[in-house]
Curated annotation (Swiss-Prot):
Keyword Signal in record: yes
Region (Disordered): 47-225
Name of the featured protein: Salivary glue protein Sgs-3
Domain of life: Eukaryota
Keywords, ordered alphabetically: Repeat, Signal
Biased composition (Low complexity): 47-57, 83-225
Composition-biased stretches (Pro residues): 58-67
Organism placement in taxonomy: Eukaryota, Metazoa, Ecdysozoa, Arthropoda, Hexapoda
Signal peptide: 1-23
Amino acid sequence: MKLTIAISLASILLLSVAHVAQGCDCGCPTTSPKPCQTTVPTCAPTTTTTTTTTCAPPTRPPPPPCTDAPTTTKRTTEKSTTRRTTTTTRQTTTRPTTTTTTTTTTRRPTTRSTTTRHTTTTTTTTRRPTTTTTTTRRPTTTTTTTRRPTTTTTTTRRPTTTTTTTRLPTTRSTTTRQTTKSTTSKRPTHETTTTSKRPTQETTTTTRRATQATTTPKPTNKPGCGCKSCGPGGIPCGSCPKRQGLCTELNNLLRQLERRVRECVCGQPVWLL
């Protein structure tokens, strides 16, 4: 904006100086010449065209011929001062200022420096020690529950020997045969929801002994088996089992017999046993 104002002021000063120069007497005839044409400045404010018309010099009459008698001629010189009225017509054309900014970007060629760096890469591979994980499986403990076989106890009672002594000459020995019936009963099992019933096997053992003529033995003070007195504190014979096992076994037999009697003799259902 300041640049435009400065340029316009400079052009005005130039025009005023030019018009002052044109107002002087140029020696033209008295006829008023046509006013000099002044070009209207174009729209460009920076260019001012000034046309200055220079008038031709006045033509002087030829001198008179020379005579013997000098004649004195008085020349009356009239100075006509003609002031020219300079009419400056300024046409101010206001045009929209179109500022065209042309940005020319000149890219310099990019000079790429290729620097080849030789990089020595030393790769150190450290192998970790191989960790061998030994998984030791515990041996599978197989618990084998062995049920004791049903012990069939055959109780053989010795037949009672009745010796009848008669004065008759004939001595008769009466041997009573006794049949011992051994009942095999079930071993008590832990009852669950399902009660299984084992078949009861009956073992009948018939022992026949030969008839012998018996003699009444004399009473002795020693026990028959040669053992010490029986009881909790006594020493069992060698053929007898251990007392703890024998007690358990006899209790089981008693329970089995009771169950058998309730089931088969009394007729109680299984779920009540």
